[in-house]
Amino acid sequence: PTRRSSDLEKTDADGYDAKEFDLTLGYSTGGFSVSITDYWYNTGAGYFHYGAHNTTHLYEAQVGYDFGPVAVNWYTNFAGDDGVKENGDRAYSSYISIAAPFKLGGLDWTAEVGATPWETDFYGASGFAVCDVSLGATKDIRITNSFSLPLFAKATWNPCSERAYFVVGLSF
């Protein structure tokens, strides 16, 4: 599970929905996991612009533990195009999620609830706010005996922003 970047209202200079490119480096052992993700949007400075005040990259750290029936993850934006507090200070926008996986109809499902613990305009929250209630499914689509594509789909409702999203993709 990762942060719901689809919850962000991003448009390019012409007002079209922004394109997003995410790179994640992670490690897990047993139930413990840790990762760093670079989220990039085509909403301003080009891909190779990493300046403190002219980047559209966002860097996020994750730490979590999968207890079996429930997984708990904490995410914090630590650099890049993060949100701010009302006073203008960097918010170090953070997010905690609790996810419960289950199997149904030949698919792997996950029900998830997530919240931001403090004020940040990144998530549009003035304090603690539930910003993710979601249901997702994954299925490996077999192409050959030795190769399959891991397809996922997820429906998300954000009570804080009163918006809903549907995401489909592939995981590698």
What are these regions (language model features)?
Residues 1-5:
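Short, small-residue-biased leader/transition segments that mark boundaries at the very start
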Residues 6-28, 33-53, 124-127:
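Surface-exposed loop and membrane-interface regions of Gram-negative outer-membrane beta-barrel proteins
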Residues 8-12, 28, 37-41, 75-79, ...:
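Outer-membrane beta-barrel pore domains and translocons
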Residues 17-21, 55-61, 66-68, 88-96, ...:
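Residues that define the transmembrane beta-barrel architecture of outer-membrane proteins
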Residues 26-30, 64-70, 99-105, 138-144, ...:
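Structural signature of outer-membrane beta-barrel channels/translocons
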Residues 40-93:
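Hydrophobic, well-structured mid-protein blocks that either form specific transmembrane helices
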Residues 77, 135, 141, 161-172:
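Outer-membrane beta-barrel "beta-signal"
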Residues 108-143:
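Outer membrane beta-barrel transmembrane domains
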